[in-house]
């Protein structure tokens, strides 16, 4: 995606220490130069999707901590499901960091309707109430418990990404300056 990916800690973790963990296996490999590179494969770890709904004590959750929720290979349906959980677990604060704020800016308009259409008619999501899902109400959207950020590695990346971040509906926006 950018120069900021050259020494990615997440790729290094996935290619070394986490390479035998089923949720990370095959997502990154070491190349001939000894650099960790993602393979381009994306994976939806559905077994953990409802975990925030089960946690009672409020937490700060880094969504897709070792990946990018707005990667081009991540289907909108996966993102819809993740946002539905965030809507249903408003006691937690969810932080999303992306190098692709242009996709977030294009994706987020209409999110409330998509989630409501998919889940709003349901009283429960699995065993959990979806009391946080409201249809296009100013009080609920953007979700007050979701922070959206972009990572930037230099001024050019900041100039390219920050305008998309600022144009994206979010309760809290942030910038992560990374080498």
Tell where the protein language model's regions lie, with residue ranges.
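Histidine/lysine/aspartate-rich catalytic loop segments that bind and position anionic ligands
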Residues: 152-154, 158, 166-179
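Proline-centered loop/turn at the N-terminus of a beta-strand
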Residues: 93, 147, 172-174
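Conserved Radical SAM active-site core
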Residues: 1-145, 155-157
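Structural motif
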Residues: 62-63, 149, 176
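Conserved hydrophobic/aromatic pocket- or pore-lining residues that grip, position, or stack substrates
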Residues: 96, 148, 165
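Long, well-ordered alpha-helical scaffolding segments within enzyme catalytic domains
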Residues: 78-86, 163-170, 175
